[in-house]
């Protein structure tokens, strides 16, 4: 069932668990993620980031992920993560993505608010949900490793900023900077759990943890306990897939087709472990009903009218 973040994250916030976003930039990743979600009865978020589009275009991913989400026995959000350009976000919405993130966090705070507000209005007109970010999560999305910066705390999100940003933009989910970084860590991360708790008690909008790969199980549990409702994961499942491919190629010495089952199984196992850790197993049944029919009808009508004017 194709849904938006609004159908799964408010319930997660209320129930003190988190829904995982797993980057699904290949068919095998998507199959492993769906298999884990259906087996555990978990809501799940398919993700791809703009920096990952050279590996698979939005058009190709839309043809794979959206039909898979609609056929799934559990709620599935199809989300553009870290959309860096307005044009990319608009393309994702037109292709049928049910959710986007417009990441303007490296811009000035005022520009971040203005740009995300504009995109939030557009996303909501499509019946889609939108995520924004304030502060700065270190490292690069899709990177293999992340450096920990000693002065990173100056980029952390404050409760006051979070409240102001949510009120001014109308985002449906808020990514906050609390000490994580994209990619695997060279040094242990320094997470500010108290900051998460204060922000969660200041805003009603579900909070998102980026840069989750490489954290300990206890780190995840504590973050969710403090108020995180969505966790983004890529490095862990990416490494699991590569490790399985390498191991089975060494054993069998065969071609890519022979490796695919082991790759999908490794992804499924890795995602299942994260879902159990996040506490979302068995929570698929309490999600809302999915993208509203009225919103989908409005999108179709608007698209037809645009085509007639061209």
Task: Enumerate the predicted regions with their spans.
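Alpha/beta enzyme core
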Residues: 3-15, 25-52, 58-75, 82-203, ...
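Alpha-helical scaffold segments that flank or form the walls of functional sites
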Residues: 32-35, 265-275
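Flexible, glycine/charged-enriched surface loops at secondary-structure junctions
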Residues: 126-133, 253-264, 279-293
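Short, glycine/charged-rich beta-strand-loop motifs at protein surfaces that mediate ligand recognition
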Residues: 207-211, 228-235, 260
């Amino acid at each position: 069932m194709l849904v938006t973040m609004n159908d799964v994250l408010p319930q997660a916030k209320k129930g003190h668990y988190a829904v995982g976003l797993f980057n699904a930039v290949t068919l095998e990743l998507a199959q492993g993620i769906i298999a884990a979600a259906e087996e555990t009865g978990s809501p799940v978020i398919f993700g791809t980031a703009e920096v990952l589009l050279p590996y698979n275009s939005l058009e190709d991913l839309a043809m794979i992920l959206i039909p898979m989400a609609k056929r799934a026995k559990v709620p599935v959000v199809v989300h553009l993560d870290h959309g860096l350009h307005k044009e990319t976000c608009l393309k994702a919405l037109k292709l049928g993505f049910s959710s986007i993130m417009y990441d303007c966090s490296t811009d000035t705070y005022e520009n971040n608010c203005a740009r995300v507000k504009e995109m939030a209005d557009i996303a909501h007109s499509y019946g889609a949900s939108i995520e924004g970010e304030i502060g700065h999560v270190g490292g690069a999305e899709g990177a293999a490793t992340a450096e920990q910066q000693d002065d990173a705390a100056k980029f952390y999100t404050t409760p006051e900023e979070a409240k102001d940003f949510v009120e001014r933009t109308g985002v449906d989910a808020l990514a906050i900077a609390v000490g994580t970084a994209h990619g695997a860590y060279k040094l242990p991360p320094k997470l500010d759990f108290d900051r998460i708790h204060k922000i969660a008690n200041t805003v009603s909008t579900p909070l998102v943890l980026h840069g989750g790969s490489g954290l300990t199980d206890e780190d995840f549990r504590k973050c969710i306990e403090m108020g995180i409702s969505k966790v983004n994961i890529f490095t862990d499942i990416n490494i699991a897939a590569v490790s399985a491919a390498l191991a089975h190629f060494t054993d069998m010495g065969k071609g890519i087709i022979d490796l695919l089952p082991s790759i999908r199984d490794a992804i499924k196992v890795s995602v299942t472990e994260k879902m159990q850790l996040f506490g979302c197993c068995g929570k698929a049944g309490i999600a809302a009903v999915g993208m509203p029919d009225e919103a989908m009808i409005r999108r179709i009508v608007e698209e037809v009218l645009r085509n007639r004017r061209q």
